[in-house]
Amino acid sequence: MSMQDPIADMLTVIRNGQVAKKDKVYVPSSTIKIAITKVLVEEGFLKDYSVLGNIKFILEISLKYYQCNKPVIDHIQRISRPSLRVYKNKDMLPKVLSGMGVVVVSTSKGVMTDKKARKLNVGGEIICYVS
């Protein structure tokens, strides 16, 4: 597993875990990964998360499925990456599927959804799209 872009690696682990119908996936923990996971849990895309270990922290992510065993996350895509950062002001924040999906944004007030960023009148770095 390449650690050139740890956020993209986390999103790939989530995507692959849902394709493999896993209940939980594990990724190395960091502050930004915990914040992104918290937003996805609040928006209902993931079931739960917890940080394991006291020396080397691991982020345990519980995946969420519909009753028909179909993953709740249909599409998850990394937008801003280390080689090409993508920043938008509050007026230019994109909408995913006309508001049906979520854009995760890293702002000066923390990691949040595009809807919350618009409400707080802040822009920031577009981390990923989730639908």
Swiss-Prot record:
Alphabetically ordered keywords of this record: Ribonucleoprotein, Ribosomal protein, RNA-binding, rRNA-binding
Subunit (UniProt): Part of the 30S ribosomal subunit. Contacts proteins S5 and S12.
Name of this chain's protein: Small ribosomal subunit protein uS8
The species this protein was found in: Blochmanniella floridana
A Pfam family recorded for this sequence: Ribosomal_S8
GO biological process: translation
Gene3D superfamilies tied to this protein: 3.30.1370.30, 3.30.1490.10
InterPro entries assigned: Ribosomal_uS8 (IPR000630), Ribosomal_uS8_CS (IPR047863), Ribosomal_uS8_sf (IPR035987)
Domain of life: Bacteria
Gene field: rpsH
Entry similarity comment: Belongs to the universal ribosomal protein uS8 family.
Gene Ontology molecular functions: rRNA binding; structural constituent of ribosome
Function: One of the primary rRNA binding proteins, it binds directly to 16S rRNA central domain where it helps coordinate assembly of the platform of the 30S subunit.
Cellular component annotations (GO), alphabetically ordered: ribonucleoprotein complex; ribosome
